[in-house]
Amino acid sequence: MLAETPLLETTLERELATLAVGRRYGKVVEVVGTMLKVAGVQVSLGEVCELRQRDGTLLQRAEVVGFSRDLALLAPFGELIGLSRETRVIGLGRPLAVPVGPALLGRVLDGLGEPSDGQGAIACDTWVPIQAQAPDPMRRRLIEHPMPTGVRIVDGLMTLGEGQRMGIFAAAGVGKSTLMGMFARGTQCDVNVIVLIGERGREVREFIELILGADGLARSVVVCATSDRSSIERAKAAYVGTAIAEYFRDRGLRVLLMMDSLTRFARAQREIGLAAGEPPTRRGFPPSVFAELPRLLERAGMGESGSITAFYTVLAEDDTGSDPIAEEVRGILDGHLILSREIAAKNQYPAIDVLASLSRVMSQIVPYDHSQAAGRLRRLLAKYNEVETLVQVGEYRQGSDAVADEAIDRIDAIRDFLSQPTDQLSAYENTLELLTSVTDDA
């Protein structure tokens, strides 16, 4: 009899879990793709629900993403395997929340904020909802100070400000992850929050161990939802990472938030929206995607005390402006770095296209001499690009254009300035000295 007691207690616990006073249970009436239609449950939009078997066993959780007449539309956080018409749906009366605290540093979480690094539960007593309002624009502090990154081309020519939101636009395979690793190691911040959305499973550990490194991980929180995870988890990863960054910002810290990538976040939102019955609009994206982008991106930036400086990567399909996500994000953020496949083919890294990239706040955070030197280098580089073909075929005549002559004489020094080994970081003062020497009297 005593041997059966643990089993009896487990059964009773399950039954009690299904008999909570005041709860109403819903029933799954239809499964359409990745969406559940549930009847008989009183829930609100964004509420988390539990999906349980009749004996009380928890199968998984889901979020309410819409309504259709008297039915609630739920997006499960995991696989649909095991669900049936006998599955009970229980609203928890709250949205998804994530644990926050100093114990998060050095940890790796999944897209729902659960630990996925095998190091056990996170010792945090505070939980915050992953959805929050952006700071009041009239209470935000101004962006007034540079935030050195250790990447020479960025610090010198498109200087990042503390609290700035910068986009990294690039095709696949031109060094986005490597550049993010350099930012994580070299940026002078207190905490890194790194969000990986839709990545290949192989790349996650490679990024953490080979690119980020042990020292970088020690002051970082990594949130990861790989490409095989559900669309709702991939989408929620962006909000989980942002909520964690907000927690540290609200405590007066300087936070670096890096999200790879916004494109995969938008695609996950598209899957959810289309499954819920939204009409497709630009390139198949429903209206909710374009509504969610500013809600997410405006949460970063300066706060009343701390700051969130953010990098968001965007998979740019082409340069014709036909990519609606790239176009929308470019209009929201405070600047953009364009990574070029042509520059990468020349073995020049970081493969940033200087003439196409821009920091919207650089002019208000750097001194006049710095701004002038950066402008001179851009002018020389633009002029050299104009005459490069003539130089290569031997048709350029020395003395025909004074600026072109200067650009040709200095192009090797300029290229040395623009290139940087991925395992080396450049001090901000050294970057400014080198920039001045390259452009002096130009």
Curated annotation (Swiss-Prot):
| Cellular component GO terms, alphabetical | cytoplasm; type III protein secretion system complex
Q: Name one GO molecular function term.
A: ATP binding
GO biological process terms, alphabetically, are: protein secretion by the type III secretion system; symbiont-mediated perturbation of host programmed cell death
Under PROSITE patterns, the record lists: ATPASE_ALPHA_BETA (PS00152)
| Gene3D superfamilies per UniProt | 3.40.50.12240
The UniProt entry, under InterPro entries, shows: AAA+_ATPase (IPR003593), ATPase_a/bsu_AS (IPR020003), ATPase_alpha/beta_chains (IPR050053), ATPase_F1/V1/A1_a/bsu_N (IPR004100), ATPase_F1/V1/A1_a/bsu_nucl-bd (IPR000194), ATPase_T3SS_FliI/YscN (IPR005714), ATPase_T3SS_SctN (IPR013380), P-loop_NTPase (IPR027417)
Binding residues for ATP, per the UniProt record?
Answer: 173-178
Record CDD domains: ATP-synt_flagellum-secretory_path_III_N, ATPase_flagellum-secretory_path_III
Q: Where in the cell is it found?
A: Cytoplasm
Provide the reaction this enzyme catalyses. ATP + H2O + cellular proteinSide 1 = ADP + phosphate + cellular proteinSide 2
Task: Supply the Pfam families for this chain.
Answer: ATP-synt_ab, ATP-synt_ab_N, T3SS_ATPase_C
Identify the EC number(s).
7.4.2.8
Please describe the quaternary structure of this protein.
The core secretion machinery of the T3SS is composed of approximately 20 different proteins, including cytoplasmic components, a base, an export apparatus and a needle. This subunit is part of the cytosolic complex. Forms homohexamers.
Task: Summarize the protein's role.
Answer: ATPase component of the type III secretion system (T3SS), also called injectisome, which is used to inject bacterial effector proteins into eukaryotic host cells. Acts as a molecular motor to provide the energy that is required for the export of proteins. Required for type III secretion apparatus (T3SA) formation, proper protein secretion, host cell invasion and virulence. May play a critical role in T3SS substrate recognition, disassembly of the effector/chaperone complex and unfolding of the effector in an ATP-dependent manner prior to secretion.
Q: Which family does it belong to?
A: Belongs to the ATPase alpha/beta chains family. T3SS ATPase subfamily.
Q: What is this protein called?
A: Type 3 secretion system ATPase
